[in-house]
Amino acid sequence: MIIAVRSPSGTTKINVSDTAIVKDLYVKLKENNVDIDGKSITKTPRDPPLEVGDKLSSLGIKSGDLLHLVGNNNNNNNDNKASSGSNNNNNNNNISKKEISYDEKLPNGLTPRCKHAVGDKCVFCSDAQGMKRCDHPENATCPNCQNKKFKGKRLKWLCNHPAGGKCSNCLRVGKNVSYKCNHGSTATCVNCMDKDDEDQDDNEEDNKDNKDNSEIKKSGFVPKVAIKNEVKTKCLHGPNQKCINCLPKDDPNSIEVPKRRCKNHGINGSCVECIEWRESLKMRLKSQDNPHAPGALVDFQSANIFQQYIANSKYEQQRIGFLFGNFLSDGSVVVDSIYEPPQECKDKQTPTLLPDPLADKIESMASMLGLTRVGWIFSHPSRKYTMSSTEIIQAASYQNKYGPSFVTLILSVNSDGQSNMEAFQVSDQALKLEKTGEFLPTQPDPTKCKLKSPVFEEGTETINADTHFFIVTVPLKAREDKSIFNISFPVENRIPVNTLSDLASYKLEHKDVSPLKFFSDFHFLIFLLENQFLDFQSDFPIICENIRSRSSENLIGYLEIINYQIGDIIGHDQFN
């Protein structure tokens, strides 16, 4: 095997057998005219000398290994006793000076090992000296052994990137280049991290916490505070890091156009890849199977009154109404009452809504009763399509405004002349198109939605989208429980218009019922609100609260007020 031996005169390659001993190496070195007097063979310059009789194989020395021929200080001292005293004294002085220069700091705070400018710090002049994770030479430093509390300049001679870039050594240099970031708003990278800003934010949060604590002591109220830096179960990193699992997911229905950073050109440039990417952003129409509302539970007493009025007009008059009820936890809709706003119907088509001066008050009154707007209903004569393009746009507008579970009820007549009621919603794609204003205000074809920008419909690019892609069927169910509201008072905004005689007839029909049942009529409350029999600010909250709690405690006094006003119309002796 071949062994390399490094000596002060150079490196010598020696060819010995596999059973050779250390003595054979000395012989070979002497044959190659290498001075071996007073020197020993070692594995490293700091290891002890190898025994002359040891086998190389037993010492773990293999072919290709490098050994060292170093001087023996003991032999030199024994051979040169006469001059050793002065040399030893000089060596001791040098060692002591070396120890002093390495252990003690200079007046400017640096040490002889430091290679940076005054004001910077490294492992030898900072409090981080002695960290075991560093594996660099003694005259170097790294981000691991720098003082983490130090806010000065980093050691730029450690950086190997071009000017304007950043690495783990110079993260704290306050120079952010925002256009180089390609991540979301909640993520961070080496380009946008700034420790100084984080420290400032921490101080502001501490001050805010102290202020909140003082306010809590005064008021005694402890607010609910969301836990920050919560790590999800699938994440394997710490609370201050980000991964694919915890980054925000892209919303397919987001109205914001995603940004693309192309490596082929600048911000305002374009290329074939960018054109293909923009083409991929165009919507591809597809049918939606599952609605946001798993079902619509309708009070069929209200639905029958709505249907009877239209049937009595032989579908000459179409109507629109708003559904008031509640949303269940699974997104299903429960309908309690139908409010018909002011409207005008022409040519047997879908009526046009007129300005409603009571819209805000009716919304507030419904809220007092524990109700909210959960849908709308309209009727139409017999036709070949389910919803027109205009109706789809209107439904999408309502659904974006009042929530994804907002439903659309349609009352129609089939070819046999029988009434048919169905529930629908519009798809998420229709919601996105309406939110971004892609629907044109004028729709010439009721079976096609005309758009501003083209979409792909079954592989074909078009601006006239078929309405069938935007309609989602909702299961229509009957309520198993009974609504708390009665439907005896005539519905508002119909022909003929409600008058005081309707109020008198309502009182005569319900003179033997309890005050709770007398007031538990949604249309009767709207009549009181419209004719200002009671004050909306002071009286209606009390009445609505009693209806919600199913109590007649405070309704007797209001019933006497109504009786007195009706008595002026039909005579007070009618109540005796």
From Swiss-Prot:
Q: Its function?
A: May be part of a complex that binds ubiquitinated proteins and that is necessary for the export of misfolded proteins from the ER to the cytoplasm, where they are degraded by the proteasome.
Which SUPFAM superfamilies does the record cross-reference, listed alphabetically?
JAB1/MPN domain, Ubiquitin-like
Record-level GO cellular component terms:
endoplasmic reticulum; nuclear outer membrane-endoplasmic reticulum membrane network; nucleus
Q: In which pathway does it act?
A: Protein degradation; proteasomal ubiquitin-dependent pathway
What biological processes does GO assign it?
Answer: proteasome-mediated ubiquitin-dependent protein catabolic process; retrograde protein transport, ER to cytosol; ubiquitin-dependent protein catabolic process
Q: Which CDD domains match?
A: MPN_NPL4
Output one GO MF annotation.
ubiquitin binding
- Quote the protein name from its UniProt record: Nuclear protein localization protein 4 homolog
Q: Where is the composition biased (Low complexity)?
A: 72-94
Q: Which terms are listed as keywords in the entry?
A: Ubl conjugation pathway
